[in-house]
Every structure is written in C-alpha cells, then in structure tokens.
UniProtKB/Swiss-Prot annotation:
Function: Essential cell division protein that stabilizes the FtsZ protofilaments by cross-linking them and that serves as a cytoplasmic membrane anchor for the Z ring. Also required for the recruitment to the septal ring of downstream cell division proteins.
Disordered as annotated region, ranges: 120-139
Protein name, entry field: Cell division protein ZipA
Principal location: membrane
Name of encoding gene: zipA
Membrane topology designation: Single-pass type I membrane protein
Gene Ontology biological process: division septum assembly; FtsZ-dependent cytokinesis
Organism: Hamiltonella defensa subsp. Acyrthosiphon pisum (strain 5AT)
GO CC annotations on file: cell division site; plasma membrane
Length: 277
C-alpha cells in the first residue's frame, strides 16, 4: 500500500514537470512566431518605402483617372451632316474575278438590254425628284453611273438569298418598287444610289421573292448628286462587291464587262468632270 502511494506521487510529479516544460516550449514558439511576423512586416514596410522613394526619384506620382469630357453638341445638326463625308474605306476593296467563267449568257444579255432604257428613265425620275426637293433652281445635265452584279453563266440568284444580301447592304425598298440607299438628314431621306432588277421590267415584287430568280441586279447613281459624288461612288462599289461576294457573283461595269482599274478611273474622271450641286 505504501509502495502504491509512492508510485502515484512520483507519477504526479513527473506529469507536472512535463506540463511545465511543454508550456515553456509553447510560449517560446509563440514568441518566435510573433517576432518573425513583426520582422516580416518591418521588412515589407521597408521594401515599400524603398519603392516609393524610387518612384519619387523617377518623377512618378499618384495615378489619376481622367473623366472623359462630354462631347459638344452641335446646334445645327443639319449643317454638320451636310458637310460630313459618307464613311467609306480610303481604298477600293480588292475585286475578285474568275476569268475562266463567262459573265452572263447571251439570252441574259438580250433581257438586260431591254432594261437599259428603263434604268435611265428611273434614274432621271429620281434625280428630277431630288432636284425639285433640294435644288429647284439648278438645271444641269444628268449622267448615270451603273454597276451590275451578275451570276455566273447559266445561273440565277434566288430571290430569298438576294433579298437578304440586299438588306444586309443597307438598301431599303422604296419608290418605283426598287431598292435605294438613303442618307437621312433631320428626318428627310436623300437617295444616294438605287438597285433594280437587271432584267425587264426592272422592279421587284416582295410578295413573290420566294419564287423569284434573276441573272443579276443593277446599281446606279446619277450625277450630279447630293454630297460628295466620289464618296457616294465608293460606297456604291463597296455595296456591289459585298453583294457579289455573298452571292458568288461578279461585278460588271456599265458595258457588262469585267470591271478593271482603268474602268474605275474612267468612272472617277466622269465624276470629276461633273459640276457639284
């Protein structure tokens, strides 16, 4: 019995010593961690101070966010739009041709020829309306620039596909049942150029486009015209090329030949020789 008490006493003393030593070790570990954290913070602060000093020496100050100034609103929007050029690319798009494929069949040429006079008449009517609306006192000789977009030999453009491409090129269905590219100024629409069916009678019936097909279309503009004729023609050429690319067709000149750089220069020469409105 005496031996058991002695063993329990000895065990208690050993336990107390172990707990004491563990407490001392834990306290030292905590102090070491606190010291390390403080040392790290001091080091980081020192690095930040050095970086700020370097920035000051280099002349780099605090970053400031500048608010964009609100745009000035023109009092006379019509005057601004009148002098504003129609957006277009500075260079003509590269025209893609397939010289191994015939442009249009002979029968298509016969149909196309029947509409040449009608196109001229439509163009004259449109320019006459525009002249009466905007420049009633100016009487000048009318000239017409024409581009054709034709399907490859023995092929036709389907009506639905053609209509989608025409609308994608920002044409709108309007007067004389053909499409027009408009410039809108203060609620007033001005025709820049127009698009008609290449074959007789030249107009479109939107209700029958699903069952309609054609070997090609004609895009035309009159001279003199509103604004800058050269910019209008660039836009017309880009529209013709876009439709041709989407439909797999060809861009032809007014003689229904493959358009060439020389022909484009002839068009531009005609534009330069025409007085402005």
């Amino acid at each position: 019995m005496q031996d058991l008490r002695l063993m329990l006493l000895l065990f208690g003393v050993i336990t107390i010593i172990v707990l004491f030593l563990h407490g001392v070790w834990a306290r030292r570990k905590e102090r070491s961690a606190l010291f390390y954290d403080q040392k790290t913070k001091d080091q980081n602060q020192k690095e930040d101070d050095v970086l700020l000093q370097i920035l000051d020496e280099e002349g780099v100050g605090e970053v400031k966010i500048l608010k964009k100034a609100p745009p000035n609103v023109e009092k006379n929007a019509f005057d601004k739009a009148h002098h504003k050029k129609i957006p277009s690319q500075t260079k003509y798009q590269a025209l893609k041709f397939d010289s191994s494929v015939a442009c249009v069949t002979a029968s298509s040429f016969a149909q196309i020829s029947e509409t040449e006079t009608q196109l001229q008449k439509k163009s004259d009517d449109l320019s006459h309306q525009s002249k009466e609306t905007h420049h009633p006192s100016i009487q000048k000789e009318q000239k017409v620039l024409v581009l054709h977009v034709a399907a490859h030999s023995s092929r036709n453009f389907s009506g639905e596909t053609l209509l989608k491409s025409i609308l994608n090129s920002h044409f709108q269905f309007g007067d004389m049942n053909i499409f027009h590219r408009y410039l809108t100024l203060t609620g007033e629409r001005i025709t820049l150029f127009s698009l008609a069916n290449m074959v007789k009678p030249g107009f479109f019936d939107l209700k029958k486009m699903a069952h309609f097909s054609t070997p090609g279309i004609s895009i035309f503009m009159t001279l003199p015209c509103y604004g800058h004729a050269s910019e209008n023609f660039k836009l017309m050429l880009q529209s013709a090329q876009k439709i041709a690319d989407e439909l797999g067709g060809l861009v032809l000149d007014d003689q229904r030949q493959m358009i060439t750089p020389q022909k484009l220069e002839d068009y531009n020469a005609l534009i330069r020789s025409t007085p402005h409105l």
